[in-house]
């Protein structure tokens, strides 16, 4: 049986954040999400009935390969909600030039995908202002590897306190990349720098969402 995936959009741009910020990537955005974060900037893609194309793994792979771009970011929505996502990842892994990044919201089990080559996770850890902190799957922290990233999107000092505590409790700085990002327009990045200085937060990286400064913050497909 050939499975299909609900794809909201496939586009090429630069990575706006994370370890590969500024590098070209092909983005594959799936519809549907199990969380409703207060600051979500892709709410339009969260509903299962959001506009989308039904695409097979072969069609998705073909469209990616046609771009000639090697970095591939699977995003959403929540890509790991797709019932047959392992099949798609395995198909993409057949191409050694592709490097896959899965942007996931922190509530989904990562363990089924650790056996696949050239796949990294950028896992959100939702903070109190998101309204979704209680949905975080803390078991995932022990699965993360040096190639993976935990991203904290903070909108307040309370959020930063929470991010600091999670980082210390789960010893994340010795395990994976740790990135801090402001909720766009909600907190002054300068205040985040001051907080990092107060804590002596070695090893964490503050990063702004580059694409929101290059293009309109609400623009799609960039």
Where would I find each of the regions flagged by the language model?
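Conserved Radical SAM active-site core
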Residues: 5, 9, 24-25, 36-118
